[in-house]
Amino acid sequence: MRPEIVDSFVEEYNLHGPKLTLDSVSTRIHISKKTIYRFFRSKDDIYSFILADMKEEFAGKREAILSNHQLSCGEKIEGILTVKTQWEERLDFKKVHLLALDSPVVFEEAVAIVDAACSNIKKELEKGIEEGAFLSSIHVDLTIGCLRSAILYLLQTPILDQDNMGYDEAMKSLAQTLLHGIAR
C-alpha cells in the first residue's frame, strides 16, 4: 500500500504542487485518509520518504561515477551534476520552489542532498587542480559556493517554470558553465 500512496501523492503533487491534500491523495486511490496515516504520519512524512529514497539513489549513482577511474575529474563533476534519479522523471520540479515556502523542514532535507553533491564536487575540483586539469587560480570554496547558490536558486525560485526549462536541462547548463565558462 505504501508504494500506491506515494504514487498517488506524486500525481497529486504534479497537479497541485505542495498545496495538495491527503484527502485528494486518498480519493485518488479510493482509500481512507486513516489508511494513509497507518503508513505515514503526515504530508511532510511522505515528502521525507521520497527525499530519503532520492538521497539513497543519488548516493549510489554518485559513488558509481566517483569510482569510475576512466572518467576525468571534469567528467566526474559533470556526471554528479547531471545524474538523474527516478524522481526527476516522476516529479514536476517546476513546483519545487513552492515546497520551500510550504514545508521548509522538508526543503532542508533537499538542501542536504545538494550539499552532499557539492562536497563530492569540491573534492573532484581540488583533485583536478592538483592534477593540472583545472586552473590553479580557481578559488575552490568560492566556486562551490556559487554552484550551491545556483542549484538552490533553481529549487527556491520559479525560474524553471518562467524559462520553461526542465531541471535536468538546467543542471546540464550549470555543468557546462562551470566546466567550460561562458566565453566563446
Name the predicted role of every residue range.
Residues 65, 69, 95-101, 154, ...:
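Secondary-structure edge/capping motif, primarily at the C-terminal ends of alpha-helices
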Residues 22, 52-59:
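Short, basic, alpha-helical segments at the C-terminal edge of helix-turn-helix-like DNA-binding modules
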Residues 85-122:
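Short secondary-structure transition hinges
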Residues 63-90, 144-147:
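Hydrophobic alpha-helical connector segments
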Residues 4, 8, 12-45, 49:
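Helix-turn-helix
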Residues 51, 55, 107-118, 144, ...:
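Amphipathic, non-transmembrane alpha-helical scaffold segments
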Residues 75, 79, 86, 119, ...:
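C-terminal peripheral helix-coil segments that are non-catalytic and often amphipathic
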